[in-house]
Design a protein with these regions (language model features):
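Bacterial N-terminal signal peptides
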Residues: 7-16
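N-terminal secretory/targeting leader peptides
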Residues: 25-120, 129, 135-330
């Protein structure tokens, strides 16, 4: 009898307790966003990641997004490997080159002198070429949510010699990233591509081992290369698109409504980054001029013609001849 009375009292007390708020009944699903970029929204990939996360956090009651900049979750290669298996990071922002070992045809997006403008790149990536590559990515275990562009074309920067015309590049030892595309791009311009680790650029310019390197104006200032280099020739030979990629295994764990919010978030973030690209590039070029560097516009027509053969050869290697034809035609 006493035991029954105690049970009845306990049930009554429990029933009288206030119900927990809806948000406390189920923890939010966490989206972990990897980017190799620093914790600085003045960097394109970091800006894309932050815009994506902020939109999700403002528009979803069931999903929380958090950015992990500066490779906090690991180096990009290992992060991407884990994403294929549905572990570690949920998504990344970065360049297609990071995924090219999984989807070879992505290499076509990094060909020299491929992009006529930021608008050209955006139109191509929003069209049939982008859709084909998205299908390739899904087969490899990844979901592309949005494409964007880098903040700045890569140009040739020299230590002592001022490059005023295409022929001035002939024979110059120019540091490149040690990949086939970058080496082919520099050699096609008549310079001598010199593959080298990024950390060796400064001292190699000082010592004369290098005549120059190729990169964006923003990078030149960030790493103080203006202290050992004099001039920038606006070759605009490469511009890497960027994209926001989700683990396909992870993506399937979200409801259609949650997926819709994240897709909208990615596209809104990508649009913001795209819209800022021309101004950010102009700001960086103005800053290097202010720092005392000479910036020369040059006729890139001869360089573009010389790069056609390299484009053809590389596209064949990537199995992307049809994609290259579509990009050229657009």
């Amino acid at each position: 009898m006493l035991r029954s009375l105690v049970s009845l009292v306990a049930v009554a007390l429990f029933a009288a307790l206030p119900a927990p708020p809806a948000h406390a009944q189920a923890a939010k699903k966490l989206v972990r966003i990897h980017t190799a970029g620093p914790n600085d929204v003045n960097v394109d990939n970091t800006m894309l990641a932050v815009q994506f996360a902020d939109y999700i956090n403002a528009h979803s009651d069931t999903v929380e997004a958090k950015v992990f900049p500066a490779s906090q979750l690991g180096q990009s290669r290992e992060v991407i490997e884990a994403m294929r298996l549905g572990s570690g990071a949920s998504a990344t922002t970065g360049g297609p080159a990071e995924y090219a070992s999984f989807v070879k045809r992505l290499g076509v997006l990094g060909l020299p002198f491929l992009w006529k403008s930021y608008d050209h790149a955006s139109a191509v990536l929003d069209g049939p070429v982008g859709r084909e590559l998205e299908q390739d990515m899904e087969k490899a275990g990844f979901k592309v949510l949005a494409w964007s562009v880098s903040w700045g074309y890569r140009n040739v920067v020299t230590a002592k010699k001022e490059v005023k015309q295409a022929s001035d590049l002939k024979g110059l030892k120019i540091r490149t990233i040690p990949t086939k595309v970058f080496v082919a791009a520099i050699n096609a311009m008549g310079a001598n591509a010199t593959p080298m680790n990024f950390g060796e650029i400064y001292t190699s310019l000082q010592s004369g081992v290098l005549d120059g390197y190729e990169h964006t104006a923003a990078t030149t200032l960030s790493f103080k290369f203006n202290e050992v280099a004099c001039c920038i020739a606006l070759t605009r030979h490469l511009m890497d698109p960027t994209f926001l990629v989700f683990s396909l295994a992870e993506w399937k764990k979200f409801t259609p409504k949650e997926q819709e919010v994240m897709t909208t978030a990615a596209r809104a973030g990508a649009d913001t980054v795209r819209s800022m690209a021309p101004a950010r590039e102009a700001e960086a070029l103005a800053a290097v001029k202010k720092a005392g560097m000479k910036v020369n516009e040059i006729d890139t027509g001869p360089l573009q013609k010389a790069a056609v053969a390299a484009q053809d050869e590389l596209a064949k290697d990537f199995g992307a001849e049809s994609l290259l034809a579509k990009i050229r035609a657009q």
